[in-house]
Regions:
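Generic alpha-helical secondary structure signal
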Residues: 8, 21, 40-42
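Short beta-strand-centered aromatic/proline hotspots
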Residues: 15-25
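Short, surface-exposed secondary-structure edge patches
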Residues: 1-3, 26-27
């Protein structure tokens, strides 16, 4: 997972970033450590100076990954369009843990379970679950829109309409 280079776009469970430098720094013991530096792609004026770095050897632990591929987008929508596996159970405590894995494909069952739970519970759908679901859809919409060069709004609508079709 060390195949990151300057100019690459990367993502964590919240934002899309761009790597702008690779430098060697010293760790706390004075040993040289190769790090890459990145900043949010869409930083506000206040946050334009915000930068982050991560040792290249720790990228796997950082939660950062390359953006989903175009083939990954196709697989995502294909899985999203399939009916929900009836053996899956909605487990709210595991939802956030699974999201921190930052894997769009592994997010599909969680998203489908949240959506199904929303349909089944109607007005009683927990506000926290609603917020989590919207956060997932927003994050995926941002990433997929960036990769496919489509609008956020069209991807957001496509995700929601696919969820509706697969749950009927």
């Amino acid at each position: 997972m060390t195949d990151f280079k300057v100019g690459d776009h990367i993502v964590d469970f919240e934002n899309i970033y761009q790597i702008y430098a690779v430098k060697t720094q010293k760790d706390l013991k004075g040993a040289p450590v190769k790090c890459f530096f990145y900043r949010p792609l869409e930083a506000s004026e206040r946050d334009k100076s915000v930068v982050a770095s991560v040792p290249i050897d720790n990228v796997a632990k950082s939660g950062l990954r390359h953006l989903i591929s175009k083939d990954g987008v196709k697989e995502f929508f294909k899985l999203l369009g399939k009916p929900l596996d009836t053996a899956l159970l909605f487990e709210p405590k595991l939802t956030k843990e699974a999201l921190y894995l930052n894997d769009p494909i592994k997010t599909v069952p969680i998203l489908k379970l949240l959506f199904q739970n929303k349909i089944q519970t109607a007005e009683k759908f927990a506000k926290t679950n609603s917020e989590v679901m919207e956060r997932i859809v927003k994050h995926l919409s941002d990433e997929i829109a960036f990769v496919t060069k489509k609008s956020f709004k069209s991807i957001h609508s496509q995700i929601l309409s696919t969820l509706k079709k697969s749950s009927t």
